[in-house]
Amino acid sequence: MKAFIWTLSVLFFLLMGIGHGRGRQFKIKKITQRRYPRATDGKEDAKKCSYTFLVPEQKITGPICVNTKGQDAGTIKDMITRMDLENLKDVLSKQKREIDVLQLVVDVDGNIVNEVKLLRKESRNMNSRVTQLYMQLLHEIIRKRDNSLELSQLENKILNVTTEMLKMATRYRELEVKYASLTDLVNNQSVMITLLEEQCLRIFSRQDPHVSPPLVQVVPQHIPNSHQYTPGLLGGNEIQRDPGYPRDLMPPPDLVTSPTKSPLKIPPVTFINEGPYKDCQHAKDAGHSVSGIYMIKPENSNGPMQLWCENSLDPGGWTVIQKRTDGSVNFFRNWENYKKGFGNIDGEYWLGLENIYLLSNQDNYKLLIELEDWSDKKVYAEYSSFRLEPESEFYRLRLGTYQGNAGDSMMWHNGKQFTTLDRDKDMYAGNCAHFHKGGWWYNACAHSNLNGVWYRGGHYRSKYQDGIFWAEYRGGSYSLRAVQMLIKPID
């Protein structure tokens, strides 16, 4: 670029110099012609005088001496042209030096311009960066304000919750005091009830010396050493209890001394399989082979019911109508409770006399009773047929023949009506449900009491043999660990 500028400058000044030189030559020629006109004739020149003039010229360092003698116009013309060229060269050299200086100035100015442009660009970048930092700072300030607001809200919530907790703690302490007073009151009432019962028994014993129910033998004639029947998962869904619970500790007084006045409804649960089916065998035939809670609707019932179907026992299809595993449910209840059913389906429960009646009368059913003692030994009793008569007959029990290895302690109750504390239908002068603390098909009174009190540890001490016992297995003074009653259609 510099070479190009230099070339253009040289050409420009050359053209100006040439034009200036030609103009000066033209002026000199005219002056010469005017001052020294050509001789038209040599003779005329010889006759005339000759003069020499000193003519000052601009930019000529010395005077020009024009001598007409011995020189012609061409020589003078050449001399003037060389002097002009020398002057032109000097001018061009000066202009070249000036151009070089200007070029340096231009280069310096160009660098300054570039630096200015860079500085402007950096300034714009810095302005953009400052703007970004300002926006970030603004967002940070806003966020901190929001955080401080949220923190204050959380502090208010914590204060409110703390206040509520203090109120709840105060209420809890008040309830504890009330509970302690009610517990003392209940205990006192229980003691008074026991004293009144003993007084009544003493008074009644004077009138009838045989008031106490007959006790079954403490130890049966034979205890089976082994069993050929493989029981199912007794207590497979039982509620876990504290392993440190004393083995000989009896259930709370309210589980022993007072019946429940209102039926305990079975809570809603998540069904394992859809239904309804008429019984568990029907559900198994439909392809459901997993043990669990099913929706069952017997043929003559008004609505479905929930119950436990046990399919782990070969060949499966068993309907569980009663189950005891851990004493978590009170079985000392009134007639209405035993009619409708109570307990937890996946734990201890009684299906209900009406439900058992509807199930057992839609087909021919058999009964299986599984027993487990506190040494983890399991035995069973099976009856070839099972059904209940309607409520008008107080759900009278009908059983078939016995087979099994537990001993037959149920046949003594065959043909008997169901008895509860408020509905006495047994063959005894007193109320067997009162003495055995449960509802059952009592005779006078019991060789089996599977709805009695759940005692921990097996052998228990009680005046009236009110534990869960099977007289032909372990006797009446041994409370079994787990029992369950199951029915299914006869093959």
From Swiss-Prot:
Biological process annotations from GO: blood coagulation; cell surface receptor protein tyrosine kinase signaling pathway
- Here the disulfide bonds are 280-309, 432-445
Where are the glycosylation sites? Answer: 160, 188
Q: Which Pfam families does the UniProt record give?
A: Fibrinogen_C
In what residue span(s) does the Fibrinogen C-terminal domain sit?
Answer: 271-491
**Where is it localised?**
Secreted
Which segments of the protein form a coiled coil according to its record? 80-168
Identify the SMART domains for this entry. FBG
Query: Membrane-spanning regions, if any?
Result: none
Give the matching InterPro entries: FIB_ANG-like, Fibrinogen-like_C, Fibrinogen_a/b/g_C_1, Fibrinogen_a/b/g_C_dom, Fibrinogen_CS
Which PANTHER family does the protein's record reference?
A: FIBRINOGEN ALPHA CHAIN, FIBRINOGEN C-TERMINAL DOMAIN-CONTAINING PROTEIN
Q: What is this protein called?
A: Angiopoietin-related protein 1
Gene designation per UniProt? ANGPTL1
